[in-house]
Each structure stands twice: as C-alpha cells, then as structure tokens.
Amino acid sequence: MLHTGFAVPLDRANVDTDQIIPKQYLKSIKRTGFGDYLFDSWRFLDSGEIGMTPNERRINRDFVLNEAKYQGASILLARDNFACGSSREHAVWALQEYGFKVVIAPSFADIFYTNCFKNGLLPVSLSEQEIDALFLYAMQGSRIEVDLEKQRVSVKDQPEFYTFEIAENLKKKMLSGMDDIALTLSQSELIERFEAMHRENQPWLFRE
C-alpha cells in the first residue's frame, strides 16, 4: 500500500468516538451513509437528522475540515489518544466514507485501532514531534506519502521521512486486502500440520 495525498490537521487531543460520529446517527441499519455526519457537532452549526445532506446544513466555516484548502484531503492528522471512548465501528466507516485512507496520530484507542485494520483504514502512530512537523507541511499544502511496505511517512520534495511500527500480521492484512478468515485460510497447511502433530503427541485428548 502506497498512498499519497493531502492531509488535514485536526489539532485536538482525546477526540472520542461520539465526536467522530454522534450516537444519534447510529440508528441506521446500513453500513453506509455515515460520512455526512463525521465530526458533526464541529462541522455544522445546526442539529442534523439521518438522511440530511451537508448541503441542507449550516456549515461551520471555522472548522478545519471545512476550509477550502483541505477539501479532498485523504490523510487525517490528529493528536494523542484519537478515537477514545465507546466502541463503535461506525467511527471507522464515517472516516472512510468522508474520504480518509490514513489516520496519523501519536496514539489511538485500542478498539478503534483494531477496527481500522478490519475495514482497511490505515492507522499510523508517530511521535508528537513528527506529528508537529507534518502539521506544518499540511498547512503549507504539501503532499504526504505513506508507504506501508517500507513503514514510513514522507513529504513530497522533502528529504526526511518518519518510520512507524506495525505488527506483521496487520501489515500483511492491509497489503493483501484479506480479512481475518482469509488470513486464517491462507495458513491452512500449517494449521493442519499442527493438528496432526498435536493429535500424535497427545492422542488421549481426541479419544471419544
């Protein structure tokens, strides 16, 4: 996975899942349609309802996502402890439907981090100092490149880059596009070999 795009800097720490997608929009039985309500209480000055589009709302021009220069951004820069609070997979769906492919922050809530990989949204953890540098580049309109294979983030036409850690199984999942079941099936030969060895070494466990 190699993604290049513009980034929007959300300069707020401890953003919780209710701020990402408010609970009143979770009544929908569909998995789609949540992007219109991303950061709802910050993007809009009025109260929305399920089915309302942004064109029917009062836009908060002072919120960073509504600034003209950040329209079309595909990378979200955030601060520490992003997506804390209650567990809701809708938070990931809303970010993806809005157009984000990557979220970069110093840290993420564990459940949100896991949900990202289940849905193909890449969460990248960098230091606060590295995030600060990316904030400046984002505000200048620089394009940011995220290379999952090499595990690094760089800025177009700039020499420096920032490396990030990711578990090998999660990296493989993102690069292959496989879900948990597909990943398990890809290891079927090893699983069968283990089961045969287990049955041979501890046969009493398999007696009826």
Predicted regions and their residues:
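Cytosolic catalytic domains that perform sulfur/thiol-centered chemistry
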Residues: 1-79, 83-208
